């Protein structure tokens, strides 16, 4: 934002303002504020053959994710078929495998960069920097046909997708425990294995595949249980709505320097989750405000912030909101840390 615009913006501190007597933002948006799942990814020293067979011993030493759940939340009905994934890494690649339980393996699409989720599919969403900008999506069906794209930001913030991005150096293979497109028999599952080179998802000269780094990651499985739909959306960690393009709700992928099978690291959450959830509640409230009145607001009272919301934050925290008609910047200073979490109208997240 330009300085002239910033100088005209209103600055409001939540702890000095009157707030409305209502349920509050955290309750209003609680379904979209669940704590994301996390995964600690260990190194592999084996040479990985990407054939979909998962024969390498290290795959069995890699931790398995939890079973996928409904995209709308943990309290929604359990998916009919089970899906789990595993991850590994080395200096060149992020390795992903998934096993999708499936009694009838079907895949009709054969051309790259068609809308693969019109078939049953498996999808990977990656944001190596965690800022919600310029993230990556890779989809494939049971034929191994790929749809890969990059998005400058989420659709909710006016984002654009770039199908021209073909993940350079991607290796991907599938295998079937059953038969493809044969309706009269009963299949068991199909398997995906892929290797994503770090150079394909690197924004600068620094390799994001590094012990201690934390990416944002999610998996999705689109399943057509009946012809004509609606489709089922089963995911590793739920976004709280039928929308995968909410990078703030993706899981945390933490890279360990340990080799898979040689010890374990505990996940270290990079954020104070109370402050993080507060920030994104403000973001969602601003989206609704703009949808209602055609403009953002600098008033936290208008957005619906309550004393109960504020009380969830660490002692010494404060909230700031700057807004013009079509832009906003929300921030939460996390008490006792000196860190400020910031998000703007584009969904760009920063820690200052």
Tell where the protein language model's regions lie, with residue ranges.
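Exposed beta-strand-loop-beta-strand "reactive/processing" segments of non-cytosolic proteins
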Residues: 307-336
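Structural preference for beta-rich elements and adjacent junctions enriched in aromatics
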Residues: 21-291, 324-327, 338-340
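A short, surface-exposed beta-strand/turn
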Residues: 337-352
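Bacterial Sec-dependent N-terminal signal peptides
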Residues: 1-24
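In a subset of proteins, long, contiguous C-terminal domains/tails are tracked
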Residues: 2, 13, 256, 347-348
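Short, glycine/small-hydrophobic-rich surface segments
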Residues: 281, 286-311
């Amino acid at each position: 934002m330009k300085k002239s615009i910033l100088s005209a913006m209103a600055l409001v501190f939540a702890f000095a303002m009157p707030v409305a007597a209502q349920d509050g933002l955290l309750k209003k948006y609680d379904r979209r504020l669940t704590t994301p799942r996390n995964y600690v990814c260990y190194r592999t020293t084996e040479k990985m053959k990407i054939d979909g067979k998962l024969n390498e011993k290290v795959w069995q030493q890699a931790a398995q994710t939890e079973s996928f759940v409904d995209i709308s939340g943990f309290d929604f009905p359990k998916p009919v078929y089970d899906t789990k994934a595993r991850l590994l890494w080395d200096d060149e690649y992020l390795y992903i495998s998934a096993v999708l339980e499936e009694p009838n393996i079907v895949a009709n699409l054969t051309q790259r960069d068609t809308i693969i989720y019109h078939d049953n599919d498996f999808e990977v969403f990656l944001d190596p920097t965690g800022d919600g900008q310029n993230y990556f999506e890779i989809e494939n069906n049971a034929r191994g046909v790929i749809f890969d794209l990059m998005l400058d930001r989420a659709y909710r913030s006016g984002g654009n997708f770039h199908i021209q991005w073909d993940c350079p150096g991607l290796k991907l293979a599938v295998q079937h425990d059953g038969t493809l497109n044969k309706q009269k028999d009963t299949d068991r599952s199909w398997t995906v294995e892929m290797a994503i080179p770090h150079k394909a998802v690197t924004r600068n000269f620094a390799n994001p595949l590094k012990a201690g780094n934390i990416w944002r990651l999610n998996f999705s499985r689109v399943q057509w249980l009946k012809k004509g739909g609606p489709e089922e959306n089963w995911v590793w960690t739920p976004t709280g709505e039928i929308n995968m393009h909410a990078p703030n709700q993706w899981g945390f992928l933490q890279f360990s320097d340990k080799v898979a099978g040689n010890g374990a690291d505990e996940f270290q959450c990079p954020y104070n989750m109370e402050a993080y959830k507060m920030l994104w509640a403000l973001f969602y409230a601003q989206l609704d405000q703009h949808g209602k009145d055609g403009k953002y607001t600098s008033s936290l009272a208008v957005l619906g912030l309550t004393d109960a919301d504020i009380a969830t934050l660490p002692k010494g925290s404060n909230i700031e909101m700057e807004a013009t008609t079509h832009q906003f910047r929300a921030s939460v200073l996390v008490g006792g840390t000196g860190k400020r979490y910031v998000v703007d109208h584009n969904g760009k997240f920063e820690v200052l």
